[in-house]
């Protein structure tokens, strides 16, 4: 069982604070991941209820990264991405690539945070939905140009089908002789992708041959928020937990 060791107040919301859950003496979730889950909830990015996804699936939860709108939220978001990238991929990369449109601010704020946290200057790059045919920055990309030998990390908010990678990877590979080191998303929904068995991140890994990772998974979210109070209300109660379990019984990756 997790142990409550206090309460914190953020943005006028009071949260119970838990120590990481331990199994066999092993801490299963890093502190920054627990903080990131709280951050998604308090930013109204991660919501629970009844939602219809683009895929047509009925889901008891929904993530909207477009709800990060303030300077302080974007600063924190960049820091969480930077920490996860540093922990997962280390420093051996040159460019953060965020596919348009939501990936554009992700690449910018993460590049800033990486410089501040780890003292390494990395460039950011994004693609354009429509090629610009005039001016000094004309072309298919925003930010830094991709160069031969660049090692690139892709950044997205969430990957549910891998469709964005189908469009983005050929663009990046076609721009220069680069190596795509990996992909980092904020949340792995852990549900089956187009193939019907593996999750979308695993499908991307198998298809393109680079690593994929997420700051947190839905398993982390449930572990952190189940029976946890926010403003006197449990975030994931028994009823919602049952709905999430039923959703993954139907759509969960094998």
What are these model-derived regions, one by one?
Residues 3-155, 160-254:
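PRPP-associated nucleotide enzymes
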């Amino acid at each position: 069982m997790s142990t409550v060791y206090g309460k914190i107040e953020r943005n006028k919301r009071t949260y119970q604070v838990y120590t990481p859950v331990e199994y066999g003496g092993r801490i299963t979730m890093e502190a920054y991941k627990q903080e990131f889950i709280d951050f998604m909830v308090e930013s109204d990015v991660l919501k629970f209820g009844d939602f219809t996804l683009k895929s047509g699936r009925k889901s008891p939860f929904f993530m909207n990264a477009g709800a990060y709108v303030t300077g302080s939220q974007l600063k924190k978001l960049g820091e969480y991405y930077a920490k996860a990238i540093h922990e997962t991929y280390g420093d051996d990369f040159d460019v953060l690539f965020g596919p348009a449109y939501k990936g554009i601010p992700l690449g910018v704020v993460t590049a800033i945070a990486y410089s501040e946290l780890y003292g390494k200057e990395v460039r950011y790059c994004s693609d354009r939905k429509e090629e610009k045919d005039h001016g000094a920055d004309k072309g298919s990309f925003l930010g830094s140009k991709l160069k031969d030998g660049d090692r690139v990390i892709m950044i997205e908010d969430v990957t549910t089908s891998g469709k964005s990678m189908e469009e983005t990877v050929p663009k990046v590979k076609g721009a220069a002789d680069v190596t795509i080191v990996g992909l980092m998303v904020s949340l792995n929904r852990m549900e089956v992708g187009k193939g019907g068995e593996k999750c979308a991140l695993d499908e991307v890994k198998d298809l393109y041959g680079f690593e994929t990772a997420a700051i947190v998974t839905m398993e982390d979210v449930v572990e952190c928020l189940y029976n946890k109070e926010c403003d006197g209300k449990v975030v994931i109660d028994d009823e919602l937990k049952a709905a999430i379990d039923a959703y993954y019984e139907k759509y969960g990756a094998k």
